[in-house]
Amino acid sequence: LGQENTIIDVSNAYFDTIHRWLPMVSKKRLDMGLPLQNAGPDLAMLFLAMKLITEPVTPVPDLTLYREAKTFVALLESDGVISLFLLQAMILIAVYEFGHAIYPAAWMTTGACARYSDILGIGPGDFTILEQVVSQIGRHLCGIVS
């Protein structure tokens, strides 16, 4: 991702495309967040997943970025990072895997997302985390896939 302009381009590409049918990441929350240079690795992972999911489809996909994203998720998990940003990144990776027919990884990642949401206290019909997000950013609701 490197430079701030790249992150802005990735964010714009994501919100212009994927976000239209999977409104899971709050643009307002990202815009109100910390300056990018002060952000944590979980936010960097989310931007990496946003870049991955918005990459143009090619006849023979280059899986380098995908492998880097999977490795970064594993590193964050082993470091004990628990955050909504990381869950959102994992969901985007699962969508990428399903879209590119990367099996059984797609099922494994989906299962990991379900278990990770349990750690965050997000369950079917449980909107506690949403209420916390809404209180932080006003009436803007951030959707979550459960």
Describe every region a protein language model picked out:
Residues E4-S146:
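Acidic, Ser/Thr-rich, low-complexity intrinsically disordered regions in fungal proteins
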